[in-house]
């Protein structure tokens, strides 16, 4: 006889509502999202060509959220320009240098959603 655990079902259902900022170590992060915030800050400071690639990664992350994230928001950035968005990533990375770019980007989206 199979007995459903109502508390377990509730717990699993509630996991679907975890914000993007609460990322588990099991998230599949591809490409530039794996670099550390320390590297992000260093490359932005040195005007390294990698900074443009990493900026494009963050913009792609935001675009993907706009496409596949919670609706009805069309543009979570609210039309902010790239420099404003990157300044917010800079701020997060200065405060959390051990985070990766994915976590900083997820935190930015969470902040923009509020």
Locate each region found by the language model.
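Intrinsically disordered, low-complexity cationic segments
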Residues: 1-2, 95
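Bacterial N-terminal signal peptides
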Residues: 4, 9-14
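Secreted/extracellular small peptides and ectodomain modules produced from precursors
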Residues: 10-11, 35, 91
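Bacterial Sec-dependent signal peptides at the C-terminal "C-region" and cleavage site
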Residues: 12-25
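Short N-proximal segments of mature Sec-exported proteins
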Residues: 25-88
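Short, compact, well-ordered microdomains
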Residues: 83-112
């Amino acid at each position: 006889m199979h007995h459903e655990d109502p508390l377990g079902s509730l717990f699993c259902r509630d996991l679907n509502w975890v914000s993007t900022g609460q990322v588990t170590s099991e998230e599949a992060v591809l490409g530039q999202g794996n670099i550390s915030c320390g590297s992000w800050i260093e490359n932005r400071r040195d005007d390294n060509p990698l900074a443009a690639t990493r900026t494009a990664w963050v913009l792609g992350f935001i675009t993907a959220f706009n496409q596949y994230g919670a609706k009805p928001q069309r543009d979570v950035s609210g039309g902010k320009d790239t420099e404003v968005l990157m300044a917010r990533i800079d701020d997060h990375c200065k405060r959390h240098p051990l985070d990766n770019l994915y976590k900083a980007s997820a935190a930015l989206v969470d902040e923009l959603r509020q």
